[in-house]
Amino acid sequence: MGMIVQGCEATIKVIALVGERGREIPEFIHYNLNNNLENTVIVTATSDESPLMRKYAAFTAMTIAEYFRDKGYDVLLMMDSVTRFAMAQREIGLSTGEPPVSRGYPPSVFALLPQLMERAGNSKKGSITAFFTVLVDGDDLNDPIADQSRSILDGHIVLTRDLTEQGFYPPINILKSASRVIDKVVTKEHYNDFLKLKRVLSLIKENEVL
């Protein structure tokens, strides 16, 4: 996240830290942002706060991003993490008597995700480019929150534990990552090179046990 924030050209950066441990927030500011908070808004709700606080921290960050977008700015929004936002809504939903429908998550969780995520995007004056992190157990991409997020967003970048163990950083699994808009935002040559690279990586993956 810090690399993206420092390297982006967005005028305004909005960072939502939902469900993080309290000590991780100053560490993130110091080590990842190098204490540089210029044109940056940070919204936090730590793991020891109530589910309502964690839930509305995400919506507050999105509202702040929308405010600057409607003022004509290009905004970068980063939210860590959607999983903890969903867990907060799960606590709220189950406490009000909602039945769990998928791995303990009630229907309200899956109704809220598009209400949050689909607010990002362009307006007549500005734009919001949003990155939402999703945590999955054991790199299981069939996790219901990951699955629902993929169906809403324009693309996903998959980071895997096995690439981390091999020393790759950032550990991006190119074969599992995807973009619905890549052919619209890069040159034709770039896109063709990407397809060639993906075919090569696919062959390596198929034959890695040999």
PLM regions and their residue ranges:
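P-loop NTPase catalytic core
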Residues: M1-L210
